[in-house]
Amino acid sequence: MKKGLVLGRFQPFHLGHLNLIRTVLKDKNEPLICIGSAQCAHTKDNPFTVKERRDMIKLVMAELNCNYTIYEIPDINNYDKYVSHLEEFVPKFDTVYSGNTLVQRLFQTAGYEIVIPKMINREVWEGATIRQAMTEGDEWEGAVPPQIVDMIYHLNVIERLKNLA
C-alpha cells in the first residue's frame, strides 16, 4: 500500500485535518501523520503537548478503522533542510497531502507528488481561528470532532489558553 504523508501541528486536531486524512484514505493510501513543532507546548500558538496531540489523533483515527502511523517532527527553522529533516523521522512515502502552500512548495521542490485537498470551511477549520474562538468565548465546538471537544474540556485547555494570552 502506498503511503500518504499528512503534516500538521494539530493545535487542536480539527475537521480540516479529518478531511485531509479522509482524502488520503479515499486515495487508498496509508496515512503517515506527522506532528510538526513537536517540541512546542504550552504557548499561545501551541497550547497542546505532543502527547495531547498524539492522543487527539488516536481518538479520531480509532473511528476510521484503518492502518496509520504517527510521527513527531521537531522544528529546525530551516526551510531548505526541512524535507530532509522530516525524512530522517519518517519511512519512505509516496505523496504529500497538504493545503499549506509552504508545505506544498517544499515537498514539490524535493520531488514529491502533492495532493491539494478540496478546502472546506477554511476560515473556520483552522487552528488559530479555533484557539481565538476558545479564548474569546465564541463557538468553536463545530470545528473539531466531538471526541476532541470532550478532550479539550477535560484538559481545561480554554483556561490554559486564557492564561497564555
Regions found by a protein language model. Name each.
Residues 1-165:
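Nucleotidyltransferase catalytic core that binds NTPs
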